[in-house]
Structures are given as structure tokens and as C-alpha cells.
């Protein structure tokens, strides 16, 4: 998956001369936590987070009156509080690479640029949660089961055959390294809602033939 299919393209931006007061207002108006700073050609030259605005704002214990505060906030510019030369990602980068960057760098979002370095979007940790929801198919409800397998070629075929025998419709499948050992994999399967008696028979067969870690029936209507 490439981030160009998941990023937010309607990006709120600032220029180096935008006042901190305006940046703060934009964050509140659009309910966002970061604003890229761009030059006249739309290259990303910085980024401002809500933390940057908070750190640069006067303390609540200040003795300044309202007019003095307004003047101060109007005089501080984006260039004064932005993080210059921020990390950016290309619109063709994979979702997985971007998620790794966000995790390893401890940041909440990244500007997305095209091959010419021009800002075309932004991808945030919130977007990554939306991607997980869509890719996992959790909105469809049904059940999720986790099964551990010894890593190898064709090890999932017997399980797929069993699902087919019970007319189980597979919505999504994810895999991950297992805590059971370096040669083990955990497979997470989401299955469309089934008639309860057939579902119970499938559960019993999976338990009998495979190392089933869990089986969860989810009601997304309660969310």
C-alpha cells in the first residue's frame, strides 16, 4: 500500500511570515496538531506542532495584559518556532515504511512530497489507525481467530481447506512474528459473520487440528 492512497491531501499550511497567532487559530479551526511551513514554490521548509506553539506561548502566570499578549503573539512568526528541514516522505512510499518512521522517530505525522519535493499531502498517526481499520475489515464484524504455525511453505493450506469446507468467507489476513519462538508465525484471520452452529463447529475443528491462540466474536455496532 502506498501512502498516496491514504494521505490527507487538503493540507493546511503556513508561510515563514505567518504569525504564531494565526497558526494557533488554524490548528483550533481545523482540529489539527501540525502545520507544514512552505516557501512560495510549495517546498516544505519547516513544520510546526501544537507543542511548538505551546512552548512559544507566554505562561498563564504572565503579567502581560490582553493587548500586550495579542501583540506578542502577532509578532512571533512561523519561522521563529518551526522545526526546519523536517523529515518528509514520498507519495509512493509504502504505508509500512511510513509507520516505521513515525514509530522510530516518535513523531505524530509527516509531510508528503512528490518527486519534485513539492508538498502534496500529510500522513498522521490518526491516518494509520484508519488504515488498520480498513485493511483489517473490522467494520464487517464477524470473528477474528489467531493461529500459530511453524514457519514454512504451504503450512496454511490445510487451514484454508477447512475454512472452505465450512463455507467461511475470509475478510482479511495478517501475520506477525510469534512470541512462541523464532521459527513460529502468528496468523490473524477475520471471517465474515456465520450461522452460529456452523461457526461453533469450525471453532472446534480449528482447535483440534491447529494451535489456535484465540477466537473473538466482535460486535462493531457497540463501538
Each model region followed by its residue ranges:
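Tandem CBS (Bateman) regulatory domains
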Residues: 1-10, 50-87, 94, 99-103, ...
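Basic, Lys/Arg-rich alpha-helical nucleic-acid-recognition elements, primarily the DNA-binding modules
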Residues: 1-53, 57-59
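Short acidic-hydrophobic, aromatic-tinged amphipathic segments that line or gate anion-handling sites
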Residues: 14, 89-90
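A glycine-centered beta-loop-beta connector
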Residues: 27, 35-52, 102, 110-126, ...
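Short acidic/polar active-site loop segments enriched in Thr and Asp
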Residues: 33, 108, 169
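Short, ordered loop/turn segments at secondary-structure junctions
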Residues: 40, 115, 175-178, 218
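Conserved short beta-strand edge segments in small beta-sheet-based binding/regulatory domains
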Residues: 171-173, 203-223
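A short, glycine/Asx- and small/polar-enriched loop/turn
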Residues: 181-187
Amino acid at each position: 500500500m502506498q501512502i498516496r492512497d491514504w494521505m490527507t491531501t487538503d493540507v493546511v499550511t503556513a508561510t515563514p511570515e505567518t504569525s504564531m497567532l494565526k497558526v494557533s487559530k488554524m490548528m483550533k479551526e481545523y482540529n489539527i496538531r501540525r502545520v507544514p511551513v512552505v516557501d512560495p514554490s510549495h517546498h516544505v521548509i519547516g513544520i510546526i506542532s501544537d507543542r511548538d506553539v505551546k512552548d512559544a506561548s507566554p505562561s498563564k502566570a504572565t503579567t502581560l495584559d490582553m493587548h500586550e499578549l495579542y501583540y506578542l503573539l502577532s509578532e512571533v512568526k512561523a519561522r521563529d518556532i518551526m522545526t526546519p528541514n523536517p523529515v518528509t516522505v514520498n507519495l509512493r512510499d509504502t504505508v509500512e515504511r511510513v509507520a516505521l518512521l513515525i514509530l522510530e522517530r516518535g513523531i505524530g505525522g509527516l509531510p508528503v512530497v512528490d518527486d519534485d519535493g513539492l508538498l502534496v499531502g500529510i500522513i498522521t498517526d490518526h491516518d494509520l489507525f484508519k488504515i488498520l481499520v480498513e485493511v483489517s475489515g473490522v467494520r464487517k464484524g464477524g470473528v477474528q481467530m489467531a493461529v500459530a504455525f511453524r514457519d514454512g511453505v504451504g503450512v496454511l493450506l490445510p487451514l484454508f481447506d477447512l475454512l472452505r469446507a465450512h463455507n467461511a468467507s475470509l475478510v482479511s489476513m495478517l501475520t506477525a512474528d510469534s512470541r512462541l519462538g523464532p521459527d513460529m508465525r502468528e496468523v490473524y484471520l477475520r471471517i465474515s459473520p456465520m450461522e452460529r452452529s456452523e461457526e461453533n463447529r469450525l471453532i472446534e475443528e480449528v482447535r483440534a487440528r491447529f494451535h489456535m491462540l484465540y477466537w473473538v466474536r466482535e460486535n462493531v455496532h457497540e463501538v
